[in-house]
Regions:
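Primary mode marks residue(s) on the alpha4-beta5-alpha5 output face of response regulator receiver
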Residues: 26-191
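Sec-dependent signal peptide cleavage junction
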Residues: 19-27
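Bacterial N-terminal signal peptides
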Residues: 9-18
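Bacterial N-terminal signal peptides that target proteins for export
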Residues: 1-9
Length: 191
């Protein structure tokens, strides 16, 4: 008799678990879409790198690539935003470009906050619309203090996910120190 009642209870519990999982996945997809749309609206003018430099962004650390991972691209960083200890979806600390056909193309953004500034008033790592930031310790390749970061590939698809650090579809192939970025910037206006 007890087994007769056990099966319906198990089926009800499994159904509730499945519905909860679907609801959570749906909420996460909505948050992801909202964040990507926010990034696109906030950065559409920065497709022109001259607009980015006029807004306080500057070239930082060349083109970042990994041997197996793809690349992170060419970062233009606004130091005032990095140092403010705040996260604002409409004001990313870094804009990510890639040189394609001799032009700088906006491919994504990176939100960055110095860990010491964040940790002074928060107990958990930063999140933005449901996305948890990654921690990068020091020392690091950028020669900056430990920081939290979140990439958003809003302008170029990333088959590994829109919030992963590395994008196999981004390349540093056309990048050479100095002149390639300067020449690409001169030809990037209006795309």
């Amino acid at each position: 008799m007890k087994r007769k009642f056990l099966l319906p209870v198990v089926l009800i519990l499994l159904s509730l678990f499945a519905l909860t999982t679907v609801a959570l996945a749906s909420t996460n997809n909505v948050q992801q879409g909202t964040l990507v749309n926010t990034v696109r609206n906030a950065t559409k003018n920065f497709k022109d790198v001259d607009a980015a430099t006029s807004a306080g962004y500057g070239l930082f650390h060349g083109c970042v690539s990994g041997p197996q991972e793809g690349a992170m691209g060419i970062h233009y960083v606004n130091g005032d935003l990095v140092g403010d200890g705040e996260i604002d979806a409409s004001h990313p600390e870094a804009l990510i470009y890639e040189i394609r056909d001799g032009r700088l193309r906006l491919v994504g953004v990176e939100y960055v906050v110095i860990a010491e500034a964040w940790d002074a008033s928060h107990e958990m790592p930063p999140t933005l619309m449901g996305q948890v930031f990654h921690y990068a310790g020091a020392p690091n390749r950028y020669k900056i203090p430990a920081f939290y970061e979140l990439h958003v590939w809003a302008w170029k698809e990333n088959p590994n996910g829109m919030f992963t650090d590395w994008n196999p579809k981004v390349s540093c192939e056309e990048y050479t120190e100095g002149t390639a970025v300067e020449n690409a910037a001169e030809h990037s206006s209006g795309h």
